[in-house]
UniProtKB/Swiss-Prot annotation:
Ranges for domain Helicase ATP-binding: 25-182
Species the sequence originates in: Rickettsia bellii (strain RML369-C)
Biological processes per GO annotation: nucleotide-excision repair; SOS response
Name the record gives this protein: UvrABC system protein B
Gene it is expressed from: uvrB
Subunit annotation: Forms a heterotetramer with UvrA during the search for lesions. Interacts with UvrC in an incision complex.
Length: 661
């Protein structure tokens, strides 16, 4: 059994050793929930990594969005290069769920675009969980959505060992049942091909490796891992386990049993709708379901097969669907990052999904069993989760109630940096005062972050500062991902001195060059000026040894009072620690990983082409598909050097797209 092994030049420092010991002590004492209160720059990810290494338990880390999940995944991948660090998020680049609008009698068909790279990584994650223990899966909250049953998924695997006999026709049939496609010309992920005594399989969890099964009659002589592009043999394998090309693969008997149960439910639903004199709905549900049943009978699958998942998994009506949590071992560990945001998201997901599907069921577009194709209810998630460590700088009531108010604090930073000094100034004439503060901050070589309450005010302030010849940019939700990354890069490199935003200057925005955070209209109580929002925004100045925060307010609100009191409490603890050990705070100039990814793409494509590609997901996906076809064509023409060059470019784009998604 492999153990977790951290590869890093750093050792736990500051509050990290104490926090690691306390969390591990709680885990050993069977505490179900613990709270790790980690402030900005305290090294929460490195602390989590050390807890994982010392407990040596399979781990799931949940983040509240794909971007944060990608950041954590990249960091964990670099900390644990010898272990299985996996990424599990929604594989849709674009997703429009099916819906019906009764008021206008409009039915919207399901429309989606699947990201092949993320689909591959999802398969890699479930495979790792089933085959090994040194696994870290970094996931978004979408992991609470239904997934194929782990029992069926594993039951459907094809296990191969050299020296054993496998009737070739049966093997090929098994591959088809696993939803692999025979393609003797275009060999890509999820395909197999037959050449003489060889069967080549491109597993669902690989992008650059395939397996060659060499037979003598029905006896499997060798299994070679090879490069599907060049045909070069890489290594000989002692065994191979082929997993399904979908998490919803099912044995024929299960499909037949499900068909029978779907027909039974259909007849009950038809009888009910007729009793309500809903003739249109009766005709609609009969026509749609009969078509799905025909497809299931002929192919073992159908469009929207997930809506019948209850029958395939053997669950009863109302029971929770199988999710990623059922793939976890019983002794797994769960970290919920930025839990003050993640937990409310988990709580909200079920109700939104339910409301849409109830309309579909009521109007004859789906059977009632479709309601069981859903995310977990919050109570179900709470019941399923293993021993959990919530991680946040601003824990909410749920986490504090779960831990009995006990908190393990990460307040002292390894760098010795203090929480920023907070100054309150009158909101009257706040813009004029801000201009003076901006001037003095820029003179020191630092940049400025300004947060406003409304989009209109942010736009007006940006225009005003630009008229005064300040290099200013505006960060808002309509900006494409690449442009956002470019703005942050320009800010850090000094091309921009001031960044104005509304609610985008909070979690995950780490800019060591920031010398001032200005919060306009700080006394306007509400979501954007709550205690949590203020503490998170104040934290943006905590990566600079000279960082300051100015709150413009005409009155002291409860949120301001609590936020400043908490910041000063932390600052006092940090100052005392620094004085005791003679530590001098020093700004750490840390590169933003996503910027490095962007530069990798820039090095292979010109800036104009890069910007055009990342303007929208459709352009990027089309270009990646085009590159893949060119690569395969070059390989088939035996132009291996050109094919390898295209493969490198393709891999770079896919990795960057993942970071920037």
């Amino acid at each position: 059994m492999s153990n977790f092994s951290i590869i890093s030049d750093y050792k736990p420092a500051g509050d990290q050793p104490k926090a690691i010991d306390e969390i591990i002590k709680g885990l050993n004492n069977k505490k179900r929930s613990q709270m790790l209160l980690g402030i900005t720059g305290s090294g929460k990810t490195f602390t989590m990594a050390n807890i994982i290494e010392r407990t040596n338990r399979p781990t799931l880390i949940m983040a509240h969005n794909k971007t944060l999940a990608a950041q954590i995944y990249s960091e964990m991948k670099s900390i644990f290069p010898k272990n299985a660090v996996e990424y599990f998020v929604s594989y849709y680049d674009y997703y429009q769920p099916e819906a019906y609008i009764p008021k206008t009698d409009v039915f919207i068909e399901k429309d989606s675009s699947i990201n092949e790279q993320i689909d591959l990584m999802r398969h890699s994650a479930t495979r790792s969980l089933l085959e090994r223990r040194d696994v870290i899966v970094v996931s978004s909250v979408s992991c609470i959505y239904g997934l194929g049953s782990p029992d069926l998924y594993y039951q459907m695997t094809v296990n191969l060992e050299p020296g054993k006999s496998y009737p070739r026709d049966k093997l090929l049939n098994d591959l088809v049942n696993l939803q692999y496609e025979r393609n003797d010309i275009g060999f890509e992920r999820g395909c197999f091909r037959v050449k003489g005594d060889n069967v080549d399989v491109f597993p669902s969890h690989y992008s650059d490796k395939a397996w060659r099964l060499s037979f003598f009659g029905n006896e499997l002589e060798y299994i070679h891992e090879f490069d599907p592009l060049t045909g070069e043999k890489l290594v000989k394998l002692d065994k191979a386990i082929i997993y399904g090309n979908s998490h919803f693969v099912m044995p024929k008997e299960t499909v037949n049993k499900a068909i029978s149960e779907i027909e039974e439910e259909l007849q009950k639903r038809i009888a009910f709708l007729k009793s309500q004199d809903k003739l249109l709905e009766t005709q609609r549900i009969n026509q749609r379901t009969q078509y799905d049943l025909e497809m299931l009978t002929e192919t073992g699958s159908c469009k929207g097969v997930e809506n019948y998942s209850r029958f395939f998994t053997g669950r009863k009506a109302g029971e929770p669907p199988p999710t990623l949590f059922e793939y976890l071992p019983k002794d797994a560990l769960l970290f919920v990052d930025e839990s003050h945001v993640s937990v409310p998201q988990i709580r909200a997901m079920y109700n939104g999904d339910r409301a849409r599907k109830e309309v579909l069921v009521e109007h004859g577009f789906r059977l009632p069993s479709a309601l069981d194709n859903r995310p977990l209810k919050f109570e179900e998630w709470d019941n399923f989760r293993p021993q959990t460590v919530f991680v946040s700088a601003t824990p909410s009531l749920f986490e504090l109630n779960e831990t009995g108010g006990e908190v393990v604090e990460l307040i002292i930073r390894p760098t010795g940096l203090l929480d920023p000094e907070c100054i309150i100034k009158p909101a009257t004439n706040q813009v004029e005062d801000l201009v003076g503060e901006i001037q003095s901050t820029i003179a020191k070589g630092f940049c400025v972050l300004v947060t406003t309450l409304t989009k209109k005010m942010a736009e007006d302030l940006t225009n005003y500062l630009q008229e005064l010849k300040y290099k200013t940019s505006y960060l808002h939700s309509n900006i494409h991902t690449l442009e956002r990354i470019e703005i942050l890069r320009d800010l850090r490199q000094g091309t921009i001195d001031i960044l104005v935003g509304i609610n985008l200057l909070r979690e995950g925005l780490d800019i060591p060059e920031c010398g001032l955070v200005a919060i306009l209209d700080a006394d306007k109580e509400g979501f954007l000026r709550s205690e949590v929002s203020l503490i998170q925004t104040i934290g943006r100045a905590a990566r600079n040894s000279e960082g300051r925060v100015i709150l413009y307010a005409d009155k002291m609100t409860k949120s301001i009072d609590k936020a400043i009191s908490e910041t000063m409490r932390r600052r006092t603890i940090q100052q005392e620690h620094n004085e005791k050990y003679g530590i001098i705070p020093k700004t750490i100039n840390r590169t933003i990983h996503a910027l490095a990814e962007l530069e990798k793409v820039d090095s292979k494509l010109d800036k104009k082409q890069t910007h055009n590609l990342f303007e929208n997901p459709a352009k990027l996906k089309a270009h990646i598909d085009k590159l893949r076809k060119e690569m395969l064509k070059a390989a088939s023409n035996l132009e291996f050097e050109q094919a390898a060059k295209l493969r490198d470019q393709l891999k770079t784009l896919e990795e960057a797209a993942l970071e920037l998604s």
